[in-house]
Amino acid sequence: MYNFNEAEYRTNLTRQIDTFGQGVELAKEITKDGYSNIFFIAVGGTVAMMMHFEEIAKQLTTIPVYAEQAGEIVLTGHRHLNRDSLIIMGSKSGDTKETVAAAKWIKDNYGCRIASMVISKESPLGRLTDYQLPLVVFKGVEYEYLSVFGLFYGLLHLHNDFPQINAFEEQLKKLPDLLVAAQAKFDAPAAKIAARYYQSPYLMWIGGGELWGEIYLFTMCILEEMQWMKTKSIKSSEFFHGTLELVDENTDVFLVKSVGAARALDDRVERFLNQYGKNVVIIDIKDYMGDIDDAFAPILAPVFSTAVLNGRLSKYFEKNTGHDLNMRRYYRQFDY
């Protein structure tokens, strides 16, 4: 596969999966001390990844779970935020300006406990963090999901909302094989898609349910930030209330189909696109998940989505555009 080190990928995934128990132990400590609700707070791709946990929480637990933009919450506050809230944050570098500012604001105003996905405990965010979530590598959104899984599903398990935690951990052990297989299966399609659409003046990306954060992340962080491509991300549930009017024979449209409860909305969009669109790409994440148990498929779907989209498609866009994924015009280049 193009630009893919399989041995390194397998090693890092295994190391990250092996930290699941550390997250569960943190969940035990936090549950023993008690908490009133959970706030996921970050910016950019990290808060996009966190949207998945908020969505799954609606379906599995009565624990109030919120995903908030760090730059907003310090200005608006939140009436459910209190001294007993558990804050889950993320900044791999540990110095994301808005996230660090939000952590300081939370500590100064509420004194909440903060669990952070951060590489260094000595970073600005790390120093404000009570519980450091294990993260073994800097790059790769799949590792971010895996970093949070132990803590989040440990908390739900201890709240009697996720009794199948041991079976879930066994499913995680399949991921090195299954994620490599998923990328191998999508490699040729990704090359073909990128060659066809890398010069598109406008790309519409549609998805929803447990994958909405993934659609938002891929369009904003990968295509816009890293490739300078003009995109629009739209929820399947909202597509028929505005965006459908932009579809014609010249519109380049991508639909990423989820595997959970919202899949019926994706099916409806697919039927419309097949009738009225000409340049349509359907990526069904279910096709790439192998023998993952149906009970855990919605939880793990974003991990597979990031493997095929970020892991394969972004690499081929980079190859065709000649625009290095690490090249930025503005982001972190100067103060703004």
Q: Which residues fall in each region the model found?
A:
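Glycine-rich phosphate-binding loops that contact phosphosugars or nucleotide phosphates
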Residues: 36-171, 256-283
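Short, surface-exposed amphipathic charged segments that create phosphate/polyanion-binding patches used
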Residues: 81-83, 147-152, 247-249, 293-301
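Active-site phosphate/pyrophosphate-binding segments
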Residues: 2-37, 139-140, 147, 154-234, ...
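Internal helical hairpin/lid segments
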Residues: 213-281
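Phosphate-moiety recognition in structured ligand-binding domains
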Residues: 2-7, 269-336
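Glycine-rich, charge-decorated loop segments at or immediately adjacent to ligand/cofactor-binding or catalytic sites
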Residues: 120-133, 243-246, 289-299
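Short amphipathic alpha-helix with an adjacent loop that forms part of the alpha/beta core around
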Residues: 27-31, 75-82, 243-248
